[in-house]
Amino acid sequence: MGVTVKQLQPGDGKTYPKKGDAVTIHYVGTLENGQKFDSSRDRGEPFKTTIGVGDVIRGWDEGVPKLSLGERSVLTISGDYGYGERGFPGLIPPNATLVFDVELLGIN
């Protein structure tokens, strides 16, 4: 499956992150059953990372560049684009589909 994007709130429609760009994102990550496993919103601090260079799961590297600045969308990521067969012990089962509510706050 890879990654699907469902827009919740449009962004500017013209500014998109490219491979190697640093991005600032708020997100809430859940399993398909709705069980939350991580949230930058709960921590009160946006997450910063570089897109397209393997610093994050493949689903983010491929899904985030489809969002324009200010956009909020749901990324649904199949297990092979997430944590794969290993999962993330104690949080994410093997081959789990992940659902992220993501808001692209900044592109640096």
Curated annotation (Swiss-Prot):
Reactions catalysed: [protein]-peptidylproline (omega=180) = [protein]-peptidylproline (omega=0)
The entry's keywords: Cytoplasm, Isomerase, Rotamase
PROSITE patterns: FKBP_PPIASE
SUPFAM superfamilies in the record: FKBP-like (SSF54534)
InterPro entries: FKBP-type_PPIase, PPIase_dom_sf, PPIase_FKBP_dom
GO molecular function: peptidyl-prolyl cis-trans isomerase activity
Protein activity control: Inhibited by both FK506 and rapamycin.
TM regions (residue ranges): none
PPIase FKBP-type domain span: 20-108
Coiled coil: none
Location in or out of the cell: Cytoplasm
GO cellular component terms listed in the entry, alphabetical order: cytoplasm
Enzyme Commission number(s) from the entry: 5.2.1.8
Domain of life: Eukaryota
Primary role: PPIases accelerate the folding of proteins. It catalyzes the cis-trans isomerization of proline imidic peptide bonds in oligopeptides.
UniProt similarity note: Belongs to the FKBP-type PPIase family. FKBP1 subfamily.
PANTHER family: FK506-BINDING PROTEIN 59-RELATED, PEPTIDYL-PROLYL CIS-TRANS ISOMERASE
Protein name: FK506-binding protein 1
UniProt source species: Yarrowia lipolytica (strain CLIB 122 / E 150) (Yeast)
Gene: FPR1
